[in-house]
Amino acid sequence: MFALDSIVGKHINYALDKTQHLPNKIMNNITNTEITLQDYQYFVSRIFIGLKNLNSMLLFWDTGMGKTLTAVYIIKYIKELFPRWIILIFIKKSLYIDPWLNTIRSYISDTSNIKFIYYDSSSSLDKFNNIYRSIESSLNKKSRLLIIIDEVHKLISRTVKKDNNERNFTPIYKKLIKLANFENNKILCMSATPVTNNISEFNNLIGLLRPNVMNIKEEYINNGKLINFKELRETLLAICSYKRLIEADSLTETNYIDGYAKKNIFYHNIIMSDEQSKLYNMAEKYDYKTELGGLKTMRRLISSFAFYDLKIKGDLDNIEYNDMIKRKLAEFSEFTKNINFSESFIESFKNDNIKIKTNLPITDINNYNILYQYSCKYIETCKIILNSRGKVLIFEPLVNFEGISSLKCYFNCFNISYIEYSSKTLKTRDNELNEYNNYENNNGKKVKVCIFSYAGSEGISFKCINDIIILDMPWNESELKQIIGRSIRLNSHKDLPQEYRYVNVHFLISYTNNRKSVDKEILDIIKDKQGKINVIFDLLKSSSIESIHNTYKYIEPAENEIIFDTIRKTRMKEMNVSNVIINIKLYPISYCKDYDRATILKGLLNKDTNIVYKDNTAVAKLMIDKDNIPIFIIENDTLIYIADDYYE
């Protein structure tokens, strides 16, 4: 074990001794009932309150673990450390009433010292700039400051440079650093996913909690490990509290555990029609010409739905384009009103027997071919729904023409019942959600499907879901986790028999007829990001107060505080990565790219990672099957691996 651990362990026990008198209950003044904190909530509160020099902490807890209540408990009892505090709470505007204001009013009588700032509101940030000087001048003389940042990853993402240019939020970020690290002030950050995109976000998060102590670089991560793990860990000791019930990321299957449904992962590789492929190629050219091409916007739209005669926006202004979209939707909606597939056709469709059945109505076959021509994804979605034993969730962020509106036309053709939870259904969605979640609908007999957009990706829960379909990929795993998390909650499946307590997660990956796929591109980006982020999460877990306390639970407490003032002011030495020699065993192979199987290439394979190198540079990664076995073909008695492009 590392040298500093035992000293930090002594300080944790010092804080626990110092705060023995704090109650593990908190009174709800509205209901006049006492709430008992969970052991982990009580533990972290006592450490944060009991250690004066531990001025910063991250609550790295899963969604639903009680971060808000813990923060409110700390607000209530931090006066044990000093009698007068200004409380500054940074949150998303949508979270002001519930949970924050409601929770604070329930447990704290005097809220006059609490100020809210919305980090997603320019007017609220202007308010912060206006009160910044008055807060700064009052510190040390008569008050101390406690800063609380909810969903800190959303704030941090606003600080990361874009195209090497500083973001507008950077001045606010710098002021927060100055206030948080002013003598005797404290900062508490909270997130279930503290890093969502890249290493720069992690550096900025640490820069907020412990300024100038380190700067991690991507080259420190090699083969899924940090080459300077020990140095980083000692710099970050006790920087966070770690509480995650399920550590697997969204792309990893999990078994049923502690009230959480089993998660199965399915990838559906589907081929677009010639018409959809043609429009995709047009969209690709359009994306490359525009400033927002990196967002792959038009390709994503066409991958979902490509109505005939629907052209790329081109030179149309927004009004003209929206009018054209409305007109085309009306045409498509009118066309599908006359389609109502027969029971015999639907049964054959469910079982993938359309091509071999010769007695199906010719009208059904023609209509099916037309619908498939417009969207291979929506056809596959209908097949998954019809084969599901229970209720189905569908994530479709495209609310208008290319998304939910056209998808509902497909459902009508296949007699699939549904509700919609999006920004367009504000007046009806809550009542419909109650009907969908009703006990009598646990098997989806009354309402089979709920289509939801980003409006439903946070803050709501669905019960007894058996399948969730991801029609359009978000850009990072944390958003994906929020989306899938709507269907897998604590005890969300308790009303189903044991054998039905599962959720099948379906990723729809559509390809053109020449194997282009924006879905695959985004999925690969997510996987690459998350591989590095998981290394960071492992570092935070190892540095957490729980990890240290579990080892040194019975060590003699420190007599007074000495260590954290030193830790948070000691900068980790920069590592010269060029001096670090890492030996990797490589094997010569023949391979080809999946999209160009005619060209046979030579390379050196790292069997541990399936990465192929040429001239000391990673150039490709082997494709694997569901059993994690590399895919290959045999040509002229030569084994040839199938690979995708890979960039380090």
From Swiss-Prot:
One of its GO terms (cellular component) is virion component. Residues 48-212 form the Helicase ATP-binding domain. Residues 378-541 form the Helicase C-terminal domain. It catalyses: a ribonucleoside 5'-triphosphate + H2O = a ribonucleoside 5'-diphosphate + phosphate + H(+). SUPFAM superfamilies: P-loop containing nucleoside triphosphate hydrolases. Residues 467-533 are annotated as: Binding to the cap-specific mRNA (nucleoside-2'-O-)-methyltransferase. GO terms for biological process: DNA-templated transcription. A motif (DEXH box) lies at residues 150-153. Gene3D superfamilies: P-loop containing nucleotide triphosphate hydrolases. The keyword Nucleotide-binding applies. Keywords: ATP-binding, DNA-binding, Hydrolase, Nucleotide-binding, Transcription, Virion. It comes from the Viruses. It is found in: Virion. Pfam families: Helicase_C, NPHI_C, SNF2-rel_dom. InterPro entries: Helicase_ATP-bd (IPR014001), Helicase_C-like (IPR001650), NPHI_C (IPR013676), P-loop_NTPase (IPR027417), SNF2_N (IPR000330). It is an enzyme of class 3 (hydrolase). GO terms for molecular function: ATP binding; DNA binding; ribonucleoside triphosphate phosphatase activity. ATP binds at residues 61-68. Its EC number is 3.6.1.15. Its main location: virion. The keyword 4Fe-4S does not apply. Belongs to the helicase family. NPH I subfamily. Monomer. Interacts (via C-terminus) with RAP94 (via N-terminus). Interacts with the cap-specific mRNA (nucleoside-2'-O-)-methyltransferase. DNA-dependent ATPase required for providing the needed energy to achieve the termination of early transcripts. Acts in concert with the RAP94 subunit of the virion RNA polymerase and the capping enzyme/VTF to catalyze release of UUUUUNU-containing nascent RNA from the elongation complex. NPH-I must bind ssDNA in order to exhibit ATPase activity. This is Nucleoside triphosphatase I. It comes from Amsacta moorei entomopoxvirus. The lineage of its organism: Viruses, Varidnaviria, Bamfordvirae, Nucleocytoviricota, Pokkesviricetes. The gene is NPH1.
